[in-house]
């Protein structure tokens, strides 16, 4: 080992690097249980149909998933590798933010771990979906903003611009983070950067990166705005936004880190030593307020807390350094006890570690409803395959499978070929634009609809089974619209029916 490598390994930055590698590795080791989540199945399905945009989200996540498919096939752990690595990056950048905010090595390690154990971060490190990478870009923007404020080097606007461009190519809610940044710049001395060519170059860079999806939106009449409005109205109607404030304490952040990020926010806003970083506190509060006023989902704010955790850890270690030895020991002992307990609780409740139907599973699945949506997809496809196998041979050439939601569609797309299943169609999101095929279907296996809905489109519908899974786990597939039907004799030409068969999910 050369002296330069040895110095890096033992340096403060090296410690953060190895810690980030360890965090990513832990995700990789724990990501192999159960199966794909419904959201992952949708991403993988679109990864097999690459485009510069999709109804529900921008294209970057499907592009990353396509790389995973090329490298690892449909491996659960392989496809989730990129999400795990993303959380390693989040740990590393959070530690570096603590450094730039004045934190020593213990503060940097503390901040990195505190960011890692947030429930939304643990979920982001588990699933190959847009939230995983959106999280990275939020933290990346925060990191470059901290560097900008610390060094007064306007060239960091280029890094901010890259983060914004990549973020807008991943998830549209990044616009709230950008709005928070703009408000913070306008309300603080950072507005001096408005005269800097580097800021406008960064803005141009962001627009250049986002341009492919922007052009796609123009070509498709901004269908994603229509989708977002519909989904937002649905979320409000279903009460998904009513717990925005309490979920800041146990979804967006780990409750055991509450003292840390609160201290960080107070330090940024009010401490004389934090005056240079006032913009960070305002950036956070503006983003939080905008999302609350727009009745957004609580977890959208999650990555914004990383910079506050970094500030809180830096302040805590600085405060303890000036105290008596006994007080330092008590303070650090208490802080690390909270972090260790929070880590254990967070990992057990959020990561897919509990054996299905064990007593631990019963607890974790009640707390974290996402895990039940990782169970039963291959069983569903096998049931559909059994129905298809029983059809008369003369019907099979003109048979399609109509899927009610993107999870069912994604499962049929991923696993259907192994069973020799026919074409899958759906009116969900981007699938509607891919049409019903040619020639027109004559026999349709209907999955994920109530009988009455199927009857409204077909004169003949026969009950063919009910969705179950081998574990008896109750999830959306086994609780709602569980009937499987074989339908024939469309009531209208397919071209007319298809106009009314579009839905957003």
State the predicted function of each range.
Residues 99-102, 141-157, 266-272:
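Membrane-interface transmembrane helices that cradle and orient dolichyl/undecaprenyl
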Residues 144-165, 196, 200, 204, ...:
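Short hydrophobic alpha-helices at membrane interfaces in multi-pass membrane enzymes
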Residues 4-5, 9, 13-18, 94-117, ...:
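Transmembrane-helix signature of polytopic, membrane-embedded enzymes
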Residues 328-397, 407-410, 414-420, 427-429, ...:
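Membrane-proximal, lumen/periplasm-facing interface regions of secretory-pathway glyco-
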Residues 120, 126-134:
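Short acidic/glycine- and proline-prone juxtamembrane loop motifs at membrane-interface regions
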Residues 20, 111-119, 164, 168, ...:
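Short helix- or helix-capping micro-motifs
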Residues 81-102, 140, 144:
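Transmembrane-helix motifs of polytopic, lipid-linked glycan transferases
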Residues 175-277, 347-352:
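Transmembrane-lumen/periplasm boundary regions of multi-pass, lipid-linked membrane glycan transferases
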């Amino acid at each position: 080992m050369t002296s330069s490598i040895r110095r890096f390994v033992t340096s403060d930055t090296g410690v953060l690097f190895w810690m980030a590698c360890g965090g990513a590795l832990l995700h990789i080791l724990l990501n192999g249980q159960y199966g794909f989540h419904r959201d992952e199945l949708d991403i993988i399905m679109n990864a097999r149909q690459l485009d510069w945009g999709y109804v529900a989200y921008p294209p970057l996540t499907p592009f990353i998933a396509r790389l995973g498919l090329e490298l690892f096939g449909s491996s659960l752990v392989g496809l989730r590798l990129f999400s795990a690595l993303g959380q390693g990056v989040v740990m590393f950048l959070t530690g570096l933010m603590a450094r730039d905010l004045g934190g020593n090595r213990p503060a940097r390690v503390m901040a990195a771990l505190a960011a890692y154990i947030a429930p939304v971060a643990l979920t982001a490190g588990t699933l190959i979906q847009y939230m995983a990478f959106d999280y990275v870009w939020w933290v990346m923007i925060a990191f470059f903003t901290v560097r900008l404020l610390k060094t007064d080097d306007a060239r960091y606007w280029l890094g901010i611009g890259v983060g914004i461009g990549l973020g807008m190519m991943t998830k549209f809610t990044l616009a709230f983070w950008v709005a928070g940044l703009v408000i913070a710049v306008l309300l603080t001395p950072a507005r001096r950067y408005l005269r800097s060519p580097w800021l406008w170059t960064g803005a141009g860079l962001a627009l250049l990166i986002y341009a492919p999806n922007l052009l796609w939106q123009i070509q498709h009449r901004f269908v994603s705005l229509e989708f977002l409005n519909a989904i937002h109205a649905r979320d409000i109607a279903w009460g998904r936004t009513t717990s925005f404030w309490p979920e800041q304490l146990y979804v967006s952040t780990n409750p055991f880190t509450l003292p840390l990020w609160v201290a960080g926010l107070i330090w940024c806003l009010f401490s004389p030593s934090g005056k240079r970083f006032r913009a960070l506190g305002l950036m956070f509060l503006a983003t939080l307020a905008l999302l609350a006023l727009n009745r957004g989902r609580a977890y959208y704010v999650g990555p914004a807390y990383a910079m506050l955790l970094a500030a809180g850890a830096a302040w805590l270690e600085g405060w303890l350094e000036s105290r008596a030895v006994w007080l330092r020991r008590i303070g650090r002992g208490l802080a690390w006890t909270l972090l260790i307990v929070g880590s254990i609780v967070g990992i057990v409740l959020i990561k897919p570690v509990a054996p299905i139907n064990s007593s631990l599973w019963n607890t974790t699945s009640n707390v974290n409803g996402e895990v039940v949506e990782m169970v039963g997809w291959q069983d569903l496809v096998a049931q559909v395959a059994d129905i298809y196998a029983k059809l008369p041979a003369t019907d099979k050439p003109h048979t399609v499978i109509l899927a009610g939601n993107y999870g069912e569609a994604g499962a049929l797309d991923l696993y259907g070929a192994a069973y020799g299943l026919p074409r899958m169609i759906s009116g969900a999101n981007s699938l509607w634009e891919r049409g019903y095929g040619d020639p027109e279907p004559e026999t349709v296996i209907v999955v994920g609809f109530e009988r009455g809905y199927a009857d409204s489109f077909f004169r003949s519908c026969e009950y063919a089974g009910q969705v179950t899974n081998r574990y008896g786990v109750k999830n959306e597939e086994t609780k709602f619209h569980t009937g499987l039907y074989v339908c024939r004799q469309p009531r209208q030409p397919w071209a007319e029916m298809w106009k009314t068969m579009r839905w957003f999910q």
